[in-house]
């Protein structure tokens, strides 16, 4: 996925993910902690896509932590305080970004595309893809010489597919034998505001197997849920970002699972 991160695993990746220039989460400017986006290396991107951090496999770290607690079994999802009621939150996260990939099934001359297409830029010394934008649906495409394309910025699955087809059509009109194959949604990002402040220190301490919190590097807590496999960025203000989903239902499910946990750590 090149410079797009789906599972930010470190404070540095989370800062890049929520930066104003981020393609992973275009709505990141609404959240604290924005920073200039520095595209991770291919290795870092692959690790992030696989839900790993630079320190190793998240699953292994968490299983090891549980074994140290004498448990030896990795819980699939977080749990609220025993006996606490878990009513529905009544909150539906808003989809902020959908990242999809497409195979145009032909080699592309990126210089030709950049010269003749509107709203296209190409700086091979900086990034090995043409960056193209369209206004409707408002999206950005990363187009590679191999014929692979990444489309980001759509707010719905239908818009993502429509935008991808429009980009493919633009490439066809430039004389390339482009096809529209292997369309696949790679990541869905959602966000919401639970409208109450959260004690992040307490959450990080109680749920250390799932959490990473380094406020001097990034103001949000990184919470790695295992089932569904979603990463949540949780801010003291009560704003939440959820990423890593393949279908929108995973965003909704993850939020309903985390909501009673966050209620346990509500600031009073």
UniProtKB/Swiss-Prot annotation:
<comment type="subunit">
    <text>Belongs to the TFIID complex together with the TBP-associated factors (TAFs). Binds DNA as monomer.</text>
</comment>
<dbReference type="InterPro" id="IPR033710">
    <property type="entry name" value="TBP_eukaryotic"/>
</dbReference>
<dbReference type="InterPro" id="IPR030491">
    <property type="entry name" value="TBP_CS"/>
</dbReference>
<dbReference type="Pfam" id="PF00352">
    <property type="entry name" value="TBP"/>
</dbReference>
<dbReference type="GO" id="GO:0003677">
    <property type="term" value="F:DNA binding"/>
</dbReference>
<keyword id="KW-0539">Nucleus</keyword>
<keyword id="KW-0804">Transcription</keyword>
<dbReference type="InterPro" id="IPR012295">
    <property type="entry name" value="TBP_dom_sf"/>
</dbReference>
<keyword id="KW-0677">Repeat</keyword>
<feature type="repeat" description="2">
    <location>
        <begin position="185"/>
        <end position="262"/>
    </location>
</feature>
<feature type="repeat" description="1">
    <location>
        <begin position="95"/>
        <end position="171"/>
    </location>
</feature>
<dbReference type="InterPro" id="IPR000814">
    <property type="entry name" value="TBP"/>
</dbReference>
<protein>
    <recommendedName>
        <fullName>TATA-box-binding protein</fullName>
    </recommendedName>
</protein>
<keyword id="KW-0238">DNA-binding</keyword>
<feature type="compositionally biased region" description="Low complexity">
    <location>
        <begin position="50"/>
        <end position="86"/>
    </location>
</feature>
<feature type="region of interest" description="Disordered">
    <location>
        <begin position="1"/>
        <end position="86"/>
    </location>
</feature>
<comment type="similarity">
    <text>Belongs to the TBP family.</text>
</comment>
<dbReference type="GO" id="GO:0005634">
    <property type="term" value="C:nucleus"/>
</dbReference>
<feature type="compositionally biased region" description="Polar residues">
    <location>
        <begin position="1"/>
        <end position="24"/>
    </location>
</feature>
<comment type="function">
    <text>General transcription factor that functions at the core of the DNA-binding multiprotein factor TFIID. Binding of TFIID to the TATA box is the initial transcriptional step of the pre-initiation complex (PIC), playing a role in the activation of eukaryotic genes transcribed by RNA polymerase II.</text>
</comment>
<dbReference type="GO" id="GO:0006352">
    <property type="term" value="P:DNA-templated transcription initiation"/>
</dbReference>
<dbReference type="GO" id="GO:0016251">
    <property type="term" value="F:RNA polymerase II general transcription initiation factor activity"/>
</dbReference>
